[in-house]
Amino acid sequence: MECPFGAIDEDEKRFPLFNEERCRRCGTCMGACPVRVISFENYSCDTVGSQIKAVNIPDEFEEKPRILILACENDAYPALDMAGIQRITYSAYVRAIPVRCLGSVNTIWITDALNSGYDGVMMMGCKKGDDYQCHFVKGSEMAHYRMSKIGDTLKQLGLEPERVQTQEVAITDNARVARLIDEYVAQINEIGLSPMKGFG
């Protein structure tokens, strides 16, 4: 079971056993759950999914991309916020949604977003590895691992794997996040708009 804090065990029938005293509410288990049944108060697959669906998607005739950013609320989202406060500009075609931890990102959100006409999805989270900065220890690492396998799903949908990107961001990277976004938007423009536009 994917929990960086060991809050989920299995019984003899391999059903999950939750130890709420160890749970830090990072949502990493929610991101790993294929049937989207794990949720927390004020944070669930449905609440984030609703935010993703609420974004206006330009139609195929407008020739404007729409890019979703799922940003860790601990480092990446504050860096985006600080970029705005410092008037550092980046593409107007992105829409950022904060997530509790990058580890909480469920691949269903990615495929739902791309199926509904988003041209790309960028995930921004804390640094992983030996000198990790993830507030939930392995959340970012687990998200990177999960996203490394999404290419096959995208190919089945007839989409390029480059439409999904994961970036490590520090809370002080306010100028860098703007640059990463603009580079990604340029990459999406080069690939072309999503063939899913108009079908969502």
Task: Tell what function each PLM region has.
Residues 97-175:
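Cofactor-cradling patches in redox/metallo enzymes
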Residues 1-18, 24, 28-51:
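Iron-sulfur cluster-binding cysteine motifs and their immediate structural context
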Residues 77-81:
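Short N-terminal binding/cap micro-motifs at the start of the first secondary-structure element
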Residues 159-199:
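Peripheral docking tails and interdomain loops at the edges
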Residues 3, 23-29, 33, 72, ...:
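Disulfide-bonded cysteines in secreted/extracellular proteins and peptides
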Residues 27-40, 56-62, 66, 155-159:
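Short Fe-S-cluster ligation motifs
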Residues 43-75:
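A short, flexible N-terminal coil/short beta segment enriched in small residues
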Residues 84-96:
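Short helix-loop-beta junction
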